[in-house]
Amino acid sequence: MANFNDLNVIPDRGLSTDQSARVHMANYGDGYEQRVAAGINNLPEEWSLTWNNRSNADANKVIKFLEDEAGVTAFDWYPPDTEISSTATGASDNKLIDSAQTFTKRYLNTTVTDSTSPTPQTATVTSVDSATQLTLSANIISNGEAYTINPYKKYKCSTWNVTTPVLGYKNISATFIRVFEP
């Protein structure tokens, strides 16, 4: 699977995300209302990204990637500043415990890497137990060990725009839409 982060072309600051929970709602005559999540993947997200005044070389990397995926094939990506590098503050089988973090559902199904091992091991986050504890697919983290979480999710991009403000440079705007697939 293609990974957008491998391009090493970081979007401009000021990127934004839109999230709108999908909810089934039943309204009753007396003003009573019932709500339930619409499926298990009810938090879609769209990211508005820009790369302004980028050299043709960097811009062409982004354009080629988007053209290769053609809005059809999902790719891995995680937004800038969402990667976590920290040290575990507790230990338990198949758990990552870090009292300095605030884990959210955003980290479900992401990759955790044991940063201190000479041959780094990885595991997948299978459950967010609390704001400070994650359940992992393998027992790779011990108390005091450094780790990194790369919160990769799958996205598609079927809309992008390219302009050339001056020769040799390009502006690109794109919308990354999260897709829910294995």
Language-model region placement:
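Extracellular/virion structural assembly segments
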Residues: 1-84, 145-182
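Autoprocessing Asn-cyclization modules and mimics
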Residues: 74-143
